[in-house]
């Protein structure tokens, strides 16, 4: 829908502000572009932001998807959009890395696959990428959305 880059950023900010306002949450919205990716962030009080973040970031993912679809509707060139809320994505990544490390250690120690709790595609990808550096485990996903799980399995030599 939006034309040039600045217009697109403004339109995304407007969409995000409307979602927050409709949810009854007072926030500041910051939208910028970094290395070809549109970076958007909700800034505000943690308690209020919880409504926009949702369980394990599910609401944040949905808002991100909605804003991206609306901003680039009918356009040939689409840029990735990453929506954060007061550093939530970084905190969640740290927590997922810890879970991944524990699962990898258990898989190697016990010699059998470890199933992680169901998670969204972005989080599964983050764990896949994180554990790629290890040569003693492999990862794969199984199941159907929304119950799709990541499996951490020991590499058999």
Language-model-derived ranges and their functions:
Residues 1-157:
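RNA-contacting regions in translation and RNA-metabolism proteins
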